[in-house]
Curated annotation (Swiss-Prot):
Residues 5-266 form the Pyruvate carboxyltransferase domain. Signal peptide: none annotated. GO terms for molecular function: 2-isopropylmalate synthase activity; acetyl-CoA C-acetyltransferase activity; manganese ion binding. It catalyses: 3-methyl-2-oxobutanoate + acetyl-CoA + H2O = (2S)-2-isopropylmalate + CoA + H(+). Mn(2+) binds at D14, H202, H204, N238. This is 2-isopropylmalate synthase. Catalyzes the condensation of the acetyl group of acetyl-CoA with 3-methyl-2-oxobutanoate (2-ketoisovalerate) to form 3-carboxy-3-hydroxy-4-methylpentanoate (2-isopropylmalate). Its EC number is 2.3.3.13. SUPFAM superfamilies: 2-isopropylmalate synthase LeuA, allosteric (dimerisation) domain, Aldolase. It comes from Parabacteroides distasonis (strain ATCC 8503 / DSM 20701 / CIP 104284 / JCM 5825 / NCTC 11152). Pathway: Amino-acid biosynthesis; L-leucine biosynthesis; L-leucine from 3-methyl-2-oxobutanoate: step 1/4.
Length: 500
């Protein structure tokens, strides 16, 4: 029988501590609802005593969310616990997360206390929280640097006092995976009554070990993991939810299951990235833009024959439509043939060989090759079959002036002229296009601008991800005018789903 692993998401508490990533209450509720749909078991909604904003967020999230447990953080201080309990009064399932530092450095320098006094405070805080809620989690701050024998005494004491979950944080990201795993194993073997509670991991990524430490913790007995979307968090971040979920989905032989609906991972990642204005690293595992992109010719050939040759995860399992074959100078004939086929062009081998020679010459000059380049090599225009074409664009913008865009779209031979004001020239152009096609239901999920070369007069390329009717479409354009490139990319994406 598989072991159930509980997912405790702290994106809205620990994750939001990243400078510049603060959310308002409405945005926090939006994230909380997405986490509920994703299938997390516990949402740490905030630290109520820290600010009126955090208090309000915990209250409103408690009202808005139905299934996950809503957790509020406190110190081992009665006032903190009182405020947390008040904030959780509307929660269908509430949890108070209280605790104190247990490492010698915390005991001596932070609390000017002794080991015995810390245990007494830990017991008192746990019992006090139990007056309000049945579900009490206790954290042993800096457990990663706490010696195992003393840590076991603390854990045993708070479990006897009524803690239902005990959190073993590697607060500073100091532990190596074997050390952290051994720590959890020691507690499982030496704490009397350990099976009356759940041990939880909470790992930071200061040395890049957060996910590895978390996995080792689980393999040694922890059954709750504290994680964030995209691994965001203080300093170098926290354990990534998507990484842990996919580790155990991929390694079914471990018989550890979560409640995560994995095909919602990518959309949740992008939503959090957008709301927090924190881009996802392109090579980030699971959710990075390049996570399922292949540019090596050998890899491309293998993936085209069978994706399992170089992919251990089906992109659809995390909510990505397909892998990406990126054309570069390292790409082989198989990749070029595949891209041409996708674009509706099938060539005989002799013709393909000639086109491939020209492709290599072009690829040596350009960083990567887009669809326009590929079609140019075979004498075709990608936009020739587009139902919608941008024929004219003029934008006025400046300091102290509202941006206004005027456009002419050719819709299957019929010209439509429109103008719109917006928050900047790109927004104005997008709004004008939406007016011209009488459709404003599509939303931009991702908007990436890159310089192809150096210098202010060189070409910029725009990649745009557009969502419409629950499906995702991609648009691309390159132009020395970055505003024009942005609007062209939007029109390119629209042409993928607009039909007669």
């Amino acid at each position: 029988m598989s072991d159930r692993l509980f997912i405790f998401d702290t994106t809205l508490r620990d994750g939001e501590q990243v400078p510049g990533c603060q959310l308002n209450t409405v945005e926090k509720i939006q994230v909380a609802k997405a986490l509920e749909q994703l299938g997390v078991d516990v949402i740490e909604a905030g630290f109520p005593v820290s600010s009126p904003g955090d208090f309000k967020s915990v209250v409103e999230i408690s009202k808005a969310v139905t299934w996950p447990t809503i957790c509020a953080l406190t110190r081992a201080v009665e006032k903190d616990i009182d405020v947390a309990a008040e904030a959780l009064r509307f929660a269908k399932r509430g949890r108070i997360h209280t605790g104190i530092g247990t490492s010698d450095s915390h005991i001596k320098y932070k609390f000017n206390s002794t080991r015995e006094e810390i245990i007494e405070r830990a017991i008192a805080a746990t019992k006090y929280a139990k007056k309000y809620v049945e579900d009490v989690e206790f954290y042993c701050e800096d457990a990663g640097r706490t010696d195992n024998e003393y840590l076991a005494r603390v854990v045993e004491a708070v479990i006897k006092a009524g803690a239902t979950v005990v959190n073993i944080p590697d607060t500073t990201g100091y532990c190596l995976p074997d050390e952290y795993g051994a720590k959890i194993k020691y507690l499982m073997e030496h704490v009397d009554g350990v099976h009356n509670a759940i041990l939880s991991t909470h790992c930071h990524n200061d040395l890049g070990m957060a996910t590895a430490n978390t996995v080792q913790g689980v393999l040694n007995g922890a059954r709750q993991v504290e994680v964030t979307i995209n691994g965001i968090g203080e300093r170098a971040g926290n354990t990534s939810l998507e990484e842990v979920a996919m580790v155990f989905k991929s390694h079914k032989e471990r018989d550890i299951i979560t409640n995560i609906t994995t095909n919602k991972i990518y959309s949740t990642s992008r939503m959090v990235s957008s709301l927090m204005n924190m881009p996802v690293q392109p090579n980030k595992a699971i959710v990075g833009r390049n996570a399922f992109a292949h540019s090596s010719g050998i890899h491309q050939d293998g993936v085209l024959k069978n994706a399992q040759t170089y992919e251990i995860i089906d992109p659809k399992d995390v909510g990505i439509d397909d892998n990406a074959i990126v054309l570069t100078a390292r790409s082989g004939r198989a990749a070029l043939k595949h891209r041409l086929h996708v674009l509706g062009v099938d060539l005989e081998q002799e013709k393909l060989d000639k086109v491939y020679d020209e492709f290599l010459k072009l690829a040596d000059r350009k960083k990567d090759i887009n669809d326009d380049d590929v079609l140019m090599l075979v004498g075709k225009d990608r936009t020739a079959t587009h139902r919608i074409k941008l024929e004219y664009l003029q934008v006025t913008s400046g300091v102290g002036v509202q941006s206004v865009a005027s456009i002419c779209l050719n819709l299957s031979g019929v010209r439509r002229y429109e103008a719109a004001a917006g928050n900047g020239p790109v927004d104005a152009g997008i709004k004008a296009v939406k007016k011209a096609i009488s459709n404003s239901d599509m939303t931009i999920q991702e908007f990436l601008i890159q310089a192809i070369n150096k210098g202010s007069d060189d070409t910029g390329k725009v990649h745009m991800q557009v969502e419409y009717n629950g499906a995702t479409y991609y648009g691309f354009s390159a132009n020395t005018d970055i505003i024009a490139a942005s609007v062209e990319a939007f029109v390119d994406a629209i042409n993928k789903f607009i039909v007669d």
